[in-house]
Amino acid sequence: MEFSSKLLEKAVNEMAQLPGIGKRTALRLVLYLLKQPKDRTDFLAQSLLTMREGIIFCENCHNISDVAVCEICSNKNRNHQIVCVVEDVRDVMAIENTGQFRGVYHVLGGKISPIDGVGPSQLNISSLVEKVKSGSVSEIIFALSSTMEGDTTNFYIYKQIKDCEIITSSIARGISVGDELEYADEVTLGRSILNRIPFENSFKNN
């Protein structure tokens, strides 16, 4: 792709680093921004800077937040004894959109994947185990994607907490094997949470 401007080329190259954005799409987006009033592009740039500098991770669940404890964890109307374990913040948003879950979350920040060099120590697993062992949790719901990495992560955590006197469950397999949670429709995802099964059954049937 030939550019008549080095500044344009640099902007397109940076935009193309975003997930799912190729060079042609990046070019369209950059050219669109060039046609917008300067105050609009300034506002967009400032919003991104403010987000990057201001957003933090909740000290309880590792969800993104504007304050130390996120809105979900600080909500007294949620059941704090039921913890739904998810891979990342997109899964929290997907489950919240179903309106079927009133517990709290624990965001791992990924899943165990040796091929990608991601082990248990790179994830928020130890804080989850500590939370369970503190006695403040009555049920853990495993809601990671139905992939080999997701199942490996679920089983690793289960082994750490299986001797604790809590319920361990897994979302029902309405989510197709290999699918990421965020792509499931709200009805299917909502039902899979409501119809969750004992975790021991989930891996015995695999």
UniProtKB/Swiss-Prot annotation:
SMART domains: TOPRIM
A Pfam family per the record: RecR_C
Residue spans, zinc finger C4-type: 58-73
Residues covered by the Toprim domain: 81-176
InterPro entries per record: DNA_Rcmb_RecR, Rcmb_RecR, Rcmb_RecR_Znf, TOPRIM_dom, TOPRIM_RecR
Sequence intervals crossing the membrane: none
UniProt-listed GO biological process terms: DNA recombination; DNA repair
Keyword presence, Ribosomal protein: no
Alphabetically ordered keywords of this record: DNA damage, DNA recombination, DNA repair, Metal-binding, Zinc, Zinc-finger
GO terms for MF: DNA binding; zinc ion binding
The organism's place on the tree of life at top rank: Bacteria
Function: May play a role in DNA repair. It seems to be involved in an RecBC-independent recombinational process of DNA repair. It may act with RecF and RecO.
Annotated family: Belongs to the RecR family.
Name of protein: Recombination protein RecR
Organism, scientific name: Flavobacterium psychrophilum (strain ATCC 49511 / DSM 21280 / CIP 103535 / JIP02/86)
Gene name tied to this protein: recR
